[in-house]
Amino acid sequence: ALGLVLGVEVEASNVVNTPRRARDLLDACGSDSLKIIMDCANLFHVGRAHPRFVRETIEEAFALLGSDIALAHGKDIRESAGIDFCPAGEGIVDFPFFLQNLARVGYQGDMVLHGAYEEGAIRKSAAFLRARLAEADGGRTPA
C-alpha cells in the first residue's frame, strides 16, 4: 500500500451530493483509504443557503462523516436562493461552529482556503480564519 488517501467532497453538483450519500459510499467501499474533504459551503443545496439552516446542515454532516475527515476546506457561501460561493468570512457559514465540530471529532489536519478570486481575498480570509482559530484556542494566535 502506498499510504494514499482519496478524498471525496460532498457538493450539490457532484454525484456524492449529500452527507448521507457520502456516508453510504464510505460504508460500501469499506476502505480506510477513502475519506472526506469537509467543505461546509458545499453542503448547501439550492434554496437552503440561509442562516436558519446553517447549524443543522453542519451538524448533520459531522454526525455522518466527522470520523472520516481527511481535509477541511475554508470556503463560504452567501445567503441566496441559489449557490453563490465566496471567500471565508463573507457568507453564512458559521466558522466558529465548524471549528468546534472539527475539534470535537479530533481533526488536527490542515484547512485549505479557496473560493477567493479577487485581489486580497485570500489574505482577508486567512486573517478571518486566524482570528476564529485564536478564539477557539483561548486567544492563542495560530501560525
State where each predicted segment sits.
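Alpha-helical elements of Rossmann-like donor-binding domains used by nucleotide-donor carbohydrate transfer enzymes
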Residues: 21-24, 60, 97, 124-128
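C-terminal helical cap(s) of enzyme catalytic domains, especially alpha/beta-barrels
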Residues: 120-139
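Short, flexible loop/turn segments with low-complexity composition
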Residues: 114-115, 139-143
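Conserved hydrophobic residues forming the short capping helix/wall of the S-adenosyl-L-methionine
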Residues: 26-29, 102, 133-137
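Short acidic/histidine-rich active-site segments
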Residues: 75, 108-115
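Acidic/histidine-rich catalytic cores of soluble enzymes
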Residues: 1-92
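H/E-rich (His + Asp/Glu) clusters that bind or coordinate divalent metals
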Residues: 91, 96-105, 109-111
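Glycine-/small-residue-rich active-site loops that bind phosphorylated ligands and cofactors
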Residues: 13-14, 117-120
